[in-house]
Curated annotation (Swiss-Prot):
Residues 137-154 have a biased composition (Basic residues). Residues 175-196 have a biased composition (Gly residues). GO terms for cellular component: nucleus. It is found in: Nucleus. Regulator of type 1 phosphatases which maintains protein phosphatase activity under strict control. The keyword Metal-binding does not apply. It comes from the Eukaryota. One of its GO terms (molecular function) is protein serine/threonine phosphatase inhibitor activity. Residues 1-196 are annotated as: Disordered. Belongs to the YPI1 family. This is Type 1 phosphatases regulator YPI1. The keyword Nucleus applies. The gene is YPI1.
């Protein structure tokens, strides 16, 4: 019978509605002050990485020939200001254009136009330059063959060209119809000399 008694107690506990247990709040005064110590945040800044690529450094006396805020990388075509007689010059930057810039431009332009640059047997050419270089860069009009070329008149650009119209009065009536041969009846009705 002993086994029947615990079963009946379990059934009675299950049948009874559950009641909430009374709760108690107990506060204890603390005599020691509590301090919350948080670790301090450390911010470390690092500088930008140095660029590893090559960069070109121009001398202060190199002139921007194009006026576009950039300098050419072709060493033989960069203008270096003329040096005085008393100034020293090293062999790497010496050039034969030490006279004046306008004279050297006129000489080089006339040399290009007259075809004075003839190719030699080894392929090097001096294209009427006013400066020393190896001659392995392109020039306008350097097609060579040694023939003298006539200087061509410069052609006007698109803004300077006037549009071509048919010449008025090809058929002789003088009405400005463009000489189509159709007579005076061509065009938009109600406009022109017909309505007058």
């Amino acid at each position: 019978m002993s086994s029947a008694a615990p079963r009946s107690q379990q059934r009675q506990q299950q049948r009874q509605p559950s009641r909430p247990a009374p709760s108690q709040t107990e506060t204890t005064p603390s005599t020691t002050p509590q301090t919350h110590t948080q670790p301090q945040a450390i911010l470390r800044l690092r500088g930008a990485h140095a660029p590893t690529g090559r960069s070109v450094q121009w001398r202060s006396d190199v002139v921007d020939n194009e006026g576009l805020g950039r300098k050419k990388s072709k060493v033989c075509c960069i203008y270096h200001r003329p040096r005085g007689v008393d100034e020293s010059s090293d062999s790497s930057s010496s050039s034969s254009s030490d006279s004046s810039d306008s004279d050297s431009d006129a000489d080089s332009d006339s040399g290009r136009a007259s075809g004075s640059g003839k190719k030699t047997g080894d392929g090097n050419h001096k294209q009427g330059h006013a400066h020393d270089c190896d001659g392995h860069h392109s020039h306008r009009g350097s097609r060579g063959q040694g023939k003298a070329r006539r200087k061509r008149r410069p052609s006007p650009n698109a803004y300077e060209k006037m549009p071509r119209y048919d010449k008025p009065g090809k058929d002789g009536d003088g009405d400005g119809s463009g000489g189509s041969g159709e007579g005076k009846g061509k065009g938009v009705p109600g406009q022109g000399p017909q309505g007058a």
